[in-house]
Amino acid sequence: MLSLSHYLILGAVLFAISVVGIFLNRKNLIVLLMAIELMLLAVNLNFIAFSHYLGDIAGQVFVFFILTVAAAESAIGLAILVVMFRNLRTIHVDDLDSLKG
């Protein structure tokens, strides 16, 4: 049987992979969005693990709110990506300053 520490270690590894993904690739907007989503999923895994092992449902409810915010963040990020690619024909993060109104 898996204990709480196994889930927390898995969550920490996923979080570390996402942080490394953010620091190693600061140019591509798609990779940055995927790394941020992986970071949020690692946090959700920790919430679910704590909620299960403590017998409290509040952590599981909080995960639904995080998933809702993550979906909105992904939609806004992809909308910015589409506008950026349509106007500039590139998805490099360095070119985001040219989207000023």
Swiss-Prot record:
Q: What is its membrane topology?
A: Multi-pass membrane protein
In its UniProt entry, the species of origin is given as Azoarcus sp. (strain BH72)
Q: PANTHER family recorded for this chain?
A: NADH DEHYDROGENASE SUBUNIT 4L-RELATED, NADH-UBIQUINONE OXIDOREDUCTASE SUBUNIT ND4L
Read off the InterPro entries from this record. Answer: NADH_UbQ_OxRdtase_chain4L/K, NUOK/Mnh_C1-like
Q: Which reaction equations make up its catalytic activity?
A: a quinone + NADH + 5 H(+)(in) = a quinol + NAD(+) + 4 H(+)(out)
Recorded protein name is NADH-quinone oxidoreductase subunit K
Compartments reported by the entry: Cell inner membrane
**One of this protein's GO BP terms?**
ATP synthesis coupled electron transport
